[in-house]
Amino acid sequence: MTYQKQYQMQTHHMQQQQLHHFVFVHGSCHGAWCWFKLAAKLKLDGHRVTAIDLGGSGVDTRQLHEVRLVSAYLEPLMSFMESLPENEKVVLVGHSYGGIGTSLAMERFPTKVSVGIFLSAYMPHHDSPPAVLIQEYFTRLPEGFAMDCEFTFEEGLEHPPSSVLFGTSFLKEKAYSNCQLEDLELAMALMKPSWLYTKEMGGEDLITKERYGSGKRVFIVCEGDNVVPEEIQKWMISNYEPHEVKRIEEAGHMAMLTKPHELSQLLQEIAAKYN
């Protein structure tokens, strides 16, 4: 039996059983590895899961200078989306900065996404460039918020950072403050620097009302998030109202690690509703 035939049979089985294909897009400095708990739970329930390593992230071997353009950074996600059959729709889930990639994938492949889920994630408005949201985020952060994170500022200190690498103290006290020690140790071993692509994200028509704006969007508020504080999450929701807002209590920033069971159930409910 050919791979294509097997794929078609698996897809048919998923449709018959009301199963779904979840595609995960990680945030800055992370990789596909951060979804391992959630992916395992969804697979046990019969769903298909694809966790993407974006350019220079996770097991992607490219160095930071090799993914200087956002097209190189998002290439693994866009190539995967392009490879999907025209009749298949996926549930696209972006976390934190991964919301930018999620919105751009929804823009490029609107017919292949049943719903875009923003997990405490950047959710840009179709009327303004994503860079506006990035700038708003950094403007709202209090002085000293970044602790020992390492930044570069190619556009000058008056502009948002060009790249970031999360520091050990920042991980312990903010990003992974709700996580188990094992999760923190894994993160500290696998962190990689990431570009923020703010200059490129300032381009007009990167996202449009007709494509990204026509898609279904659900925002999941993560209570106790110390990286994307609830004030900023709520501002993004009011700035560009999604079709639905969900909430996970005491999740912190890394809900896929702190609340994998609750998040798994929530994703399945959302996927079923917007199937």
UniProtKB/Swiss-Prot annotation:
<feature type="active site" description="Charge relay system">
    <location>
        <position position="253"/>
    </location>
</feature>
<keyword id="KW-0378">Hydrolase</keyword>
<comment type="pathway">
    <text>Lipid metabolism; oxylipin biosynthesis.</text>
</comment>
<feature type="active site" description="Acyl-ester intermediate">
    <location>
        <position position="96"/>
    </location>
</feature>
<dbReference type="GO" id="GO:0005829">
    <property type="term" value="C:cytosol"/>
</dbReference>
<dbReference type="GO" id="GO:0071456">
    <property type="term" value="P:cellular response to hypoxia"/>
</dbReference>
<comment type="pathway">
    <text>Plant hormone biosynthesis.</text>
</comment>
<protein>
    <recommendedName>
        <fullName>Methylesterase 10</fullName>
        <ecNumber>3.1.1.-</ecNumber>
    </recommendedName>
</protein>
<dbReference type="GO" id="GO:0080032">
    <property type="term" value="F:methyl jasmonate esterase activity"/>
</dbReference>
<comment type="function">
    <text>Methylesterase shown to have methyl jasmonate (MeJA) esterase activity in vitro.</text>
</comment>
<feature type="active site" description="Charge relay system">
    <location>
        <position position="225"/>
    </location>
</feature>
<dbReference type="Pfam" id="PF12697">
    <property type="entry name" value="Abhydrolase_6"/>
</dbReference>
<dbReference type="InterPro" id="IPR029058">
    <property type="entry name" value="AB_hydrolase_fold"/>
</dbReference>
<dbReference type="InterPro" id="IPR000073">
    <property type="entry name" value="AB_hydrolase_1"/>
</dbReference>
<comment type="similarity">
    <text>Belongs to the AB hydrolase superfamily. Methylesterase family.</text>
</comment>
<dbReference type="GO" id="GO:0031408">
    <property type="term" value="P:oxylipin biosynthetic process"/>
</dbReference>
<dbReference type="GO" id="GO:0016788">
    <property type="term" value="F:hydrolase activity, acting on ester bonds"/>
</dbReference>
<dbReference type="InterPro" id="IPR045889">
    <property type="entry name" value="MES/HNL"/>
</dbReference>
